[in-house]
Amino acid sequence: MIDSAVTVEMRHLTRAFGSIVAVRDLNLTIAKGEVFGLLGPNGSGKTTTIRMLCGLIAPSEGTAIVAGVDVVKSPDLIKERIGYMSQRFGLYEDLTVAENMDFFAGIYGLEGPSRRGRIAEVVSFLGLNRRLYQLAGTLSGGWKQRLGLACALMHRPPVLFLDEPTAGVDPAARKGFWITISALAGQGTTVIVTTHYMDEAGRCGRIALMSQGHLIALGTAGEVAKQVGGKDLEDAFIILQERDEQEQEA
């Protein structure tokens, strides 16, 4: 029986591609309203982990429960319970901001007054009022980011996945984005983030540091740094990268 405060639980989660084990025996729990960071060098298993949690690929062993849904037994149901946003945003650039939101609201099954009401809520929450009739393709990186988040939030998902969401976005927009993420977490949304920015990783309540498919360290930024032997999170990340490179050369 899963604790009602736990929104995501991974049990011996493993994924192999032939002889290569991308994720090995991952055991984690993530609480409701937690901002949780997945951190690690390229090839560490972050993306594979997220793909399993989103129901896009099946685990080779183990399982995970996401917002009450088993990723092995009901992968299609997971898509109704999660929001996903990547650095590419997934927008239709030849549609306006309003048209993009209306399209995604329809994809998620919102109709009539509930559809219009939810769009209005998200527009207000993210400050998109003055951009509604602008083509998505003409937006700056920061505004595309807001629109991508708006589309991901349209169906009120209890779990939100952010895959390097601020890549290529200016510092001011990044700061504003994280204020929004904190507000979402305060409302009870569980947010799982991958990022290469150490300052952003430090904003997460907890971090799972991965390397070559293994969970290396878990805790706050300071705790993770200490577990790896670094003076801070950035130093710990560099130490881990150097270890990986030495092992690959050996």
What kind of region is each of these model predictions?
Residues 156:
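Conserved catalytic motifs of ABC-family nucleotide-binding domains
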Residues 218-219:
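ABC ATPase "signature
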